[in-house]
A protein has these predicted regions:
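Sec-dependent N-terminal signal peptides
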Residues: 4-13
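Secondary-structure boundary elements
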Residues: 43-136
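Active-site neighborhood of thiol-dependent amide/isopeptide-bond enzymes
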Residues: 115-173
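Hydrophobic/aromatic-rich core segments of domains that either
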Residues: 148-216, 227
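Helix-turn-helix repeat elements of alpha-solenoid scaffolds
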Residues: 208-214, 245-256
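Amphipathic alpha-helical repeat scaffolds of TPR domains
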Residues: 222-244, 265-286, 316-336
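Alpha-helical repeat scaffolds
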Residues: 249-257, 287-313
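Terminal, low-structured helical/coil segments at or just beyond the last alpha-helical repeat
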Residues: 298-344
Length: 344
């Protein structure tokens, strides 16, 4: 056990020593360290910064925080604040949330009369390029999908001090905020940005085939706290690392484990942790000639614990039916936007 923890503690430190030359892996270690400091309270918690760091690491530092991220977000904030005042949305308790939604889905001078719409090119690809889900890309192209659009909304909400949270469905995320203006019969607004709809909870549960247990334990349909949101971004950092280098290793294990300290009901993080342990075990046994010593036994024990914890999330496996429904819903939403909004 001691050898394992020594390895895990030294792993990021050893990489950071190499950071003077900044290899591709070093950008990930740097991003991890900064996110970890946010979660530990050693640095200011910033969802905007956390999202940027994951994208910056993937691009190996070729993404500027000010010019590629902050400047555009600040410009959008200025427009939304003006929109909020001019349209007297302060008369609503959720007026700022309404202003953010309007900016994203409707044509106004502030978005160049080009709303942020679903990126349908991803449907025709056998494998979606990882960067297609980046917020920095959506800010530039006004095209996004079920990750980048709600994450952009969450960043704007945080910057504008509007109460709104990310929530998950299987392989999907959306926005939740309390319906303080009683617009719907439910306590929470479930805002689906890919289809420009407010969806009732029962419909999300049915459409994504979510079981009661997954809702009860907080895996799906549960608003994330800001700390959980940054922890979720840390798990995404590990996924980006795996996508870029095509491997699970000590970094992805450490990244997922740190994320799970703050957001335990993230099935993706448990999957990353399990696959990373599997790789670590295989490599260790290859070095020892498949001798299962105390260290190997402990690694296997960690793997068993990981599987048990994953099972407790009651994750829904995405089916072809779910994928096809999401595709059709997005197509119908795009048709509505083209006919009812863009044609104005």
């Amino acid at each position: 056990m001691r050898r394992l923890w020594l390895y895990l503690l030294l792993f990021p430190l050893q990489l950071s020593v190499k950071a003077q030359s900044m290899t591709a892996e070093d950008y990930y270690v740097s991003a991890f360290n900064e996110m970890s400091d946010m979660l530990a309270g050693r640095d200011t918690l910033s969802i905007k910064r956390a999202v940027y760091l994951a994208e910056w690491a993937f691009y190996e530092g070729k993404l500027d925080y000010k010019t590629d991220f902050c400047d555009e977000i600040d410009r959008i904030k200025t427009f939304i604040l003006s929109f909020y005042e001019v349209n007297k949305l302060q008369t609503y308790k959720t007026g700022m949330q309404m202003a953010i939604s309007s900016y994203i889905v409707s044509p106004y001078s502030g978005n160049g009369y080009t709303p942020y719409t679903y990126d349908f090119e991803t449907f025709s690809m056998d494998k979606e390029p990882w960067e297609r889900q980046f917020v920095s890309r959506t800010l530039k192209t006004h095209k996004g999908q079920c990750r980048s659009l709600p994450w952009m909304y969450k960043i704007l909400a945080s910057e504008l001090n509007a109460e709104a949270s990310l929530a998950h469905a299987p392989r999907h995320c959306y926005i939740m905020y309390k319906d303080e203006d009683k617009i719907t019969p439910e306590e929470w607004i479930n805002l689906e940005l890919t289809t420009n709809q407010m969806q009732p909870a029962w419909w999300i549960k049915q459409d994504f085939e979510i079981c009661d247990s997954a809702v009860q334990v907080g895996t799906y349909m549960t608003p994330l706290t800001d700390i959980e949101t940054v922890a979720c971004q840390m798990a995404d950092l590990a996924l980006g690392y795996k996508e870029k280098f095509n491997r699970y290793d000590g970094f992805t294990y450490y990244c997922a484990s740190r994320s799970l300290e703050f957001y335990r009901m993230n099935p993706n993080a448990w999957i990353i942790r399990g696959k990373s342990l599997e790789r670590i075990i295989q490599d260790y046994l290859a070095r020892t000639g498949n001798i299962v010593d105390d260290y190997a036994a402990y690694l296997i024990h960690l793997m068993d614990e990981t599987k048990l914890s994953f099972d407790k999330t009651y994750m829904t496996e995405e089916t072809e039916g779910i994928r096809e429904r999401r595709k059709q819903q997005a197509i119908e939403a795009q048709k509505y936007i083209n006919e009812k909004i863009l044609s104005r």
